[in-house]
Amino acid sequence: MTRTRLAAVWCSLLIMLSSCASDQLADAPTPAVNPSPTTSPTLPSPSSSARLNKPPAKPQRTSVTVVMNGDLLWHNTLWFGAKEDAQRRGKGGYDFAPLLAGIKPVIASADLAICHEEVPLARLGGPYRNYPVFAAPPHVVKAISATGYDVCTTASNHAVDQGFAGVKRTLDDLDHAKIAHAGTARTKAESERPTIFTTRQGVKIGIVAATFSLNGIPMPEGKPWAVQRMSAKNLLAQAHRARVAGADIVLAAVHVGTEYSTSENAEQVRLARALTASPDVDLVYMHHPHVVQPWTRMNKKWVLYGVGNTVAQQVAPRTYEGVTGRFTFTRVGNGRFTVSKAEYIPTLVTAYRPGRPARLYQVSVALKTAKGSFRGRLLDAQRRTTATVTRKHPHGLMRG
């Protein structure tokens, strides 16, 4: 074999070896720079991560607004005006709705509105009776309902002016108008059954009521339960029954005080202290003096010593001035309801004149358009009511 041929053979062998080596390198796996572990950790999905970082939900807040005011004391001149109002509309009977129309926006907008039906109702057609032994036209109930009241308290010194028949008739008429009531009863069982109003939010509000006096008229024979009489023991027992029945809030309405006095008396103070000391009572308000009295806080709860008259036709100018309380109760989460906003709303009812029926006004609204002597009268009412209600400087009270 020549040297040239031998060289050619070696070259061929080298090329073949090189080709095989290249094929083996090409078939070999490429080593990983960062080899993965045998089991990979599970990473949270974006939605899981969002849940982990989401702040806790705020507790739910529930609020309800309650309004209450004073005596619906149906003097005969109020009937006269209601008869004139009915005649203007071409109707017979009595129309009391125009009398109360001025306060309707406040009453109708509340979650619960409470009136005080001071006197018993007569049967349709009468006889209707004025002071001192009342029997009001039953037409008043239609106006009370149309104004937006949900509940009326009925325990007062005039509750048995027409005997047990008057008690029963009044409650029957309120029932017919779908207005709840507290303070008087037709049966013993009814007297023991708590009055609880359920708001549109599902909040249950109990109303308990009692009166200090029946003007010397005996309780109907054999019916000692017909009217709730005032004592801390009785009111607290009522409040406890309301709590047991599921009430979230309990309001105590008491007919007590010195007539025509703009200051609370010792009896009112003692009663307020006893009631507010109980966890079963959330707010106390009082009527009977026919004039506004101070409001205060006791045991961290609101006490309204006097809300004055809502409608009446008495002599003293102050008896035409009243005040409506508006309280917002709020609960956070599963806690108790407490007052988160407290307001007083001065009112004024005008005197009847033939051809000019009485009218009830929300003072702040009427002042926007009133002129002359009527404006001056409204300003006097606002000043007097504000000075009296705030005399004890209750923290957090606002004028509505």
What do these predicted regions represent?
Residues 16-19:
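C-terminal motif of bacterial Sec signal peptides marking the signal peptidase cleavage site
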Residues 21-400:
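Acidic, metal/ion-coordinating pockets
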Residues 1-13:
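N-terminal export and membrane-targeting signals
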